[in-house]
């Protein structure tokens, strides 16, 4: 039933080589709030349980434990998630498709894919996904959104769409 918190998880997040403890702490906060799974890829990604991340999360009184699944490579993550029937949406400021113009499938779980904190998703990686979207913004005032801001905006809007519409 819409509006209930214990419904099937439909929003999941994949991060390609995430390395900032502060960004990870923010992402854990969002993931706990919407009860989603987090996937990470890349040998250089830092684990979510390092002391710097754990202490920041504890300082915010976050008590839930987020489910993190790690893949050694981005390709491995995409192959596994595809084999599970997930619909993969990439994020990039260099695409023309606006997030709000998405026509989401009703029969598949959604995985939103975010690139590295510094360079985003490469074109090659974007081509591996079902589609790529961007958040609308005034580019004359802001060139980009930080990873935690983009994650929050997209994850919460998808959560609202699936649970409260």
Annotated model-derived regions:
Residues 24-25, 50-51, 98-101, 122-125, ...:
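Short glycine-/acidic-enriched loop or helix-start segments at secondary-structure transitions
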Residues 9, 83, 108, 127, ...:
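Structured loop/turn residues at beta-strand edges in well-structured enzyme cores
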Residues 42-47, 70-72, 119-124, 141-147, ...:
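Short C-terminal domain-edge/linker segments immediately following a structured domain
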């Amino acid at each position: 039933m819409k509006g209930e918190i214990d419904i099937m998880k439909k929003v999941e997040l994949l991060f390609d080589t995430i390395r900032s403890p502060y960004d990870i702490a923010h992402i854990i906060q969002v993931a706990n709030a919407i009860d989603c799974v987090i996937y990470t890829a890349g040998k250089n990604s830092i684990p979510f349980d390092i002391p710097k991340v754990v202490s920041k999360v504890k300082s915010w009184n976050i008590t839930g434990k987020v489910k993190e699944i790690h893949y050694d490579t981005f390709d491995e993550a995409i192959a596994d998630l595809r084999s599970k029937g997930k619909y993969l949406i990439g994020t990039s400021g260099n695409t023309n498709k606006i997030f709000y113009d998405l026509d989401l499938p009703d029969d598949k779980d959604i995985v939103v894919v975010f690139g590295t904190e510094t360079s985003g998703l490469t074109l090659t990686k974007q081509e591996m996904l079902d589609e790529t979207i961007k958040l609308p913004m005034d580019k004359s005032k802001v060139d980009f959104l930080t990873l935690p801001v983009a994650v929050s905006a997209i994850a919460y809007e998808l959560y609202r769409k699936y649970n409260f519409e």
